[in-house]
From Swiss-Prot:
It comes from Escherichia phage RB69 (Bacteriophage RB69). InterPro entries: P-loop_NTPase, Rad50/SbcC_AAA. SUPFAM superfamilies: P-loop containing nucleoside triphosphate hydrolases. Exonuclease involved in phage DNA recombination, replication, and repair. This is Exonuclease subunit 2. Consists of two subunits: Gp47 and Gp46. Coiled coil: none annotated. Keywords: ATP-binding, DNA damage, DNA repair, Exonuclease, Hydrolase, Nuclease, Nucleotide-binding. The keyword ATP-binding applies. To phage T5 protein D13 and to yeast RAD52. Its EC number is 3.1.11.-. It is an enzyme of class 3 (hydrolase).
Length: 562
């Protein structure tokens, strides 16, 4: 029988332990008592072993919180153990991170990720974190009694113990294969659609060739004649538009002369306004704002300015008349320009339409020539494609059949399938062992669980009741009975003897003196095991092979062996 045995642990800078390491030989005696005051570090060994094996704290704290709060670095756990006649050395630390494993003195390859490396290690020693906390350790911190677990968690634990986890792996592989079959089926469907489409194209081509023969040629010829007529009509319209375009002769653009006369008229108008302003000043009298001389209506200069004003008015009238004449010419010029632009645009549009019509006529002509050509037979191509299609359909049928078979496997691998059958087979053994240990602890009731891990507790002459209705002491009896039952089952199923048991403050809880005596009886029967009792109660040291006392010196825990 294989053996899971912890030999030695050395740890430093973890919890209250500082840089001076604590070194414990774990397989030295059958029973070891570990005592100390609260906060003295008596449970730190358990944290160190758990971290060494699984890289996790035993209690429900973050990994970084177990580093010694004073030194804050160089947490290191070294663990020596045996499994299946192989000697393991595990070295694990934080700040810096360290994770090394040696088997029989040979260091294992760490090329995989730390998570994969850890999973492979747990498989190799036949122990998971959850199993360790249920069958190696019974404690008040970080330990959840089996009866306090959820139904899925209870099932998972028992499945691990019965080693039916392989079925879960098979289920994963099976589901992966189903997904792969679905993917292959989708690819085949796409291929099938492609082949069917190719066959369809060939058949359509044959039909198209048939349609292009006979009356179809005449229809195409009519289309060609209509397109040719349309092209000739467009050509005639283009020629007519070109002729009209050539007949439009543009004279010199009068816009510049029109604008120049406008500017001259504006200047003369400005002079007229200026003369009128000066005449008004002399008419109103007063003082000249420029030279300060006296202004009066009879000044001779008024007559001269009046003459100039008449000349400007005459010139302005002539320019206005000329400007009006030029405005007519400008409008005519612009109208001719627009007409030419419209004709040019119309010519371009009709040329494009004519080109498109000619292109259509060419295509129809090509279709006529194709219809008149020799008929092309695609029988060989269609035969090859049909053969390929038959092969695809056969492969798809095989996939559908395999999916059906894998569906059956899926049903078998469900909780109600093979796993359920295995669990059903072991339930009577579970109940037998549980009640065996309860009898040793002088319990006056019968405890049983069903295939769904629901408990049933009966006592002679009393009503049926539940785990939750018990006192803490009775719950402790049941928890301990379950612990030893799971250890027994794990050993029977795996063929692995678990040589280590750690009980953390179990005897300090609600268990009474009779319960403690019963537990001691069970522990004394484990002659091949190394049992560690962690307690802050008074115990008889003579009942133990060694006594490890943990105490604080300053801020750090030290160990005294007696």
């Amino acid at each position: 029988m294989k053996s899971f045995k912890l030999n030695r642990v050395r740890y430093q800078n973890i919890m209250s332990v500082g840089g001076n390491p604590i070194d414990i030989q774990l397989d030295k005696v059958q029973k070891t008592l570990i005592t100390g005051k609260n906060g003295g570090g008596k449970s730190t060994m358990l944290e160190a072993i758990t971290f060494g094996l699984f890289g996790k704290p035993f209690r429900d704290v973050k990994k970084g919180q177990i580093i010694n709060s004073t030194n804050k670095k160089e947490l290191l756990v070294e663990l020596w153990m045996e499994f299946d006649d192989k000697k393991y050395f595990i070295k694990r630390g934080q700040k810096p991170n360290i994770f090394e494993i040696s088997v029989d003195g040979v260091r294992l390859d760490e090329s995989a990720s730390s998570r994969d490396f850890q999973e492979e290690f747990e498989r190799s020693i036949g122990m998971s974190y959850a199993s360790f906390k249920q069958i190696v350790v019974l404690g008040t911190a970080g330990y959840t009694p089996f009866m306090a677990l959820s139904t899925p968690a209870r099932r998972k634990l028992v499945e691990d113990l019965l080693e039916v986890g392989t079925l879960a792996e098979m289920d994963k592989i099976n589901k992966s294969q189903v997904r792969e079959l679905n993917s292959q089926g989708q690819v085949l469907d796409a291929k099938k659609d492609g082949v069917i489409q190719q066959i369809k194209i060939y058949n359509e081509n044959i039909e198209r060739q048939k349609k292009l023969s006979g009356d179809n040629v005449a229809r195409l010829q009519n289309m060609y004649d209509d397109l040719a007529k349309e092209a000739r009509s467009l050509k005639a319209e283009i020629e007519e538009a070109n002729e009209r375009l050539l007949n439009i002769v543009l004279d010199e653009d009068p816009t510049e002369a029109f604008n120049k006369i406008g500017q001259e008229a504006f200047l003369i108008k400005s002079k007229i306004d200026s003369y009128n302003k000066v005449i008004k000043m002399y008419h109103d009298g007063g003082t000249c704002p420029t030279c300060a001389s006296q202004l009066h209506q009879g000044d001779p200069i008024v007559s001269k300015i009046t003459d100039k004003l008449h000349e400007c008015n005459h010139s302005f009238e002539q320019l206005t008349c000329h400007r009006d004449n030029l405005s007519v010419l400008v409008d005519e010029y612009r109208a001719n320009v627009k007409t030419k632009q419209d004709l040019a645009s119309d010519i371009r549009t009709k040329k494009q339409a004519m080109i498109a019509t000619i292109d259509k006529a060419k295509k129809v002509k090509a279709a006529i020539e194709q219809a008149s050509a020799e008929f092309i037979d695609h029988a060989d191509e269609i035969a090859l494609l049909q053969k390929e299609l038959d092969k695809i359909i056969k492969t798809k049928s095989d996939i559908v059949l395999e999916k059906y078979h894998r569906g059956i496997i899926t049903d078998m691998l469900k909780d109600s399938g093979i796993k359920g059958a295995i669990i059903k087979k072991y339930v009577p053994l579970f109940n037998k062992q549980i009640n065996h240990y309860l009898k040793i602890m002088e319990a006056d009731y019968v405890f049983s669980i069903d295939e769904e891990f629901n408990e049933s507790i009966k006592s002679r002459g009393r009503e049926e009741f539940s785990y939750a209705s018990f006192s803490q002491g009775e719950k402790a009896r049941i928890d301990i009975a379950l612990l030893f039952t799971w250890r027994d089952i794990a050993e029977k199923v795996s063929g692995v003897r678990i040589n280590t048991l750690i009980m953390d403050e179990v005897m300090d809880s609600a268990t009474d003196s009779e319960g403690i005596k019963a537990i001691s009886t069970i522990l004394n029967s484990l002659t091949d095991a190394n049992v560690f009792i962690i307690s802050h109660r008074d115990h008889d040291p003579q009942a133990y092979g060694q006594h490890l006392q943990m105490s604080k010196v300053g801020r750090f825990t030290v160990m005294t062996v007696s």
